[in-house]
Amino acid sequence: MRYGLPTLACGALFLCLTSCVSSLRFSAKKSSQDPLKQADPQASLSIGEKTRGMRACSGFLDLYLPPSGEALWLRLPPPVRDEGGRLVLARALYVEGLESGLGSNPVGLDRGQLGSPVLVEFSRLGNRVVLERPNLRYRADGADADERRAVDESFASSVLWAAVIAAEDPDGAVLVDFTSFVLRDAHGVARTLVGAGQGSFHLDAKRSFLESAGCHAFPDNVELSARLTFTGENPGRHVRSTSPDPNTVSLRAHHSLVRLPDVDYVHRGADPRAGGFAVRYANYAAGLEEPIHRSLAVRHRLVAANPGDASSAPVEPIVYYVDRGAPEPVRSALLEGAGWWAEAFTAAGFEDAFRVELLPEGAHPLDVRYNVIQWVHRSTRGWSYGNALSDPRTGEIIKGHVSLGSLRVRQDRLLFEGLLGTAATGTGAADDPIQLSLARIRQLAAHEVGHTLGLAHNFSASTYAGRASVMDYPAPLLSVTPDGEIDSSNAYAVGMGAWDLVAIRWLYGRAPEGIAEDEWLSSVLADAADRDLRYLSDSDARSPGAAHPLANLWDNFSNPVTGLENALAVRRVALERFGLDNLGAGQPRAHLEEVLTPVYFHHRYQVGATIKVVGGVDYSHSLIGDGRSVGGPVEGEEQRRALAILLDCLSPERLDIPESVNHLIPPRPPGQSRGEELAGTTTGPAFDALELARIQCAQVVDGLLHPERCARLVDQSRRFSDLPSLEEVIATLSERVYQPDPAATPRHGELQGIALGAVVRGIMALADDARATHGVRARARSGLRGLLALPSHVGDPSPAWRAHRDYWAVEVEAFFARPAQALPSVPDAPTLPPGGPIGGRSLGLGAYGECSGHW
């Protein structure tokens, strides 16, 4: 099998067994009701007779709607035999999604959210039509019918729906009531609500109905719409905040049935070095000398009109459409940013192959004929997505669908107003927070469209070639001028980067005449490697224990330590100047806390990047025979440099907030809750500056003492004597916080005590962490004992620090005195307020979701 469906010969066996059982059961009656024949008396009607008076919609599959609009009838064409001789009425790609959303990012039921395309086939089983999803994870490419049948019968398929045949024509075409298929909870809304802790919901059939005006049949696709109502009890806070009646949630669902693409599409094998997505499956027809697992690159069909020319127009260009619901000036920013990809296609040898336009009036954003950039509103800022809806057989992209959260641009404006103030807001100047936010939206549009073109994240791209890809998460590149001003003139790059050009060339480009495609594709990646263009993606970057120092989200600079030094300098200036001018006129002064919080944590992502240097590993993805270096541990000197600046982040000077800022923030006005954007508080309604310090200390300490990082420190130091050991890292942390400055004021003494507590708690947690190896836990326990043995002070410590020391000394003694079977009693660390969109918590080392983030 190459592009056709696997044969399900087991269906023939099922029919045979069914017939035999029926014969035994009803032989005494000699019934004429053979289960392989029509059992419904109405089935003797022709389709024309059954649908008389209904509105007909002719297309890929014909639809019939009665005047009441309460039902949907589907005509299926006469059956044809597939490659295995099985009769199939129709095959299609099926995609379901939501036309309207709940509006809550943590729950995730967004407007325009689509499921993954699946292959389905309609077949006849007695007096029923069955809609079945074949199993494409296991195939037998190019094999004969017997080999394909062996694979098909070895793995399960999934029957999605079935219905009794209502009418039939002499040629074998049949009519079925398709209403129940459209009115089912295909998107799993009830399951999602329950899984998100939002109560026990179920689909209410009495309050769910077809949207007949949204049901259309086109030559190559059928689009169906329904309004579904879910009822439940004990609704969670996200449902209460977004649904007018929290016990009743009504959403519009969408279904698409799409004609299968023709077999002219030429697939391209995926390469783990190329930075793209892939369709993966097991090919049981592979030769014994070949790997059984196969990967196909996910990409649009793009064919040169003049393949012999080095540069050619395409037979059909790739066109994206921007949602008319996006307002100006955002709409123009989306058109411009998404349009940057035209440059990459031109460089790959295609003229006018990519363009971006406004969605035609009346066009449905979920219609699979349109690649769409959709503007989505939520009650809080949230994720943006780029979905490449592809043929699961070949990887050919059928529809690109981008969902952009509308509150992102407002959050970016708030971030820049925190750093730069509000004086320039709305002026159109270079440092206008609105203009900077629009620059970010251009980047975001390009980034998400990149996903729908088949490209994955490249989280190392911000470290080379002047920010080499829009597929990284771009932190604004800010700096401090010699006269102490924050310079935002180079905040975001414009246009395609060096890696973007490579990735599109590899994915869509054509080998020159006379050169084999595989050879040419390898040369494209070899040239990129020679230019030190790295590709590191989510698996390299997102985990808190990740190892590569250059695989980071929201970072800048080729060296993480240099990047942290720069971020700390920008943060210092922003905090020193923070005041009433950082919030717009007429806003409640308490809202200064929303502006201050991201300024205080401005360096959080560079902290996360610098943590990866300690116990870090510098590597590249490679294939056998490509000549790339495997890499090795980060040099010891660089690891110790990183450790030193991370310890500096625990100093009172870094943790404190100027008193000029502390007194600015009053309690919140009546009726305004703190929300999820802010840190927790231990001081009731009053601003809690010390909680921010506790959070910052926890990020540094817990990141350094992650079990995977500690395991690497153990292994690296035993192999290379010049690299820091886990014992050295624990001892350095302990000495820094257990021997404070004797001249510290009470103000700083409390902050020193907070840092001490973070270190002791972090080592205790590591010693008790079941994920850590015995060797790591043993060193953590030894480090705790060593910490208690350190000299308590030089000179006379502040009373505040002494109180913390005495408290933690008792805690450590109690820790060691616990019975062996007792549960751990390590207190939890405070968590950072969201940097990525609401819905996930992170220590700044990663984010959750497809595309998210602070900036």
Tell me what each language-model feature is.
Residues 462, 466-855:
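Conserved catalytic/binding loops enriched for acidic/polar residues
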Residues 339-350, 450-451, 455, 476, ...:
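Sec-exported extracytoplasmic/periplasmic mature domains
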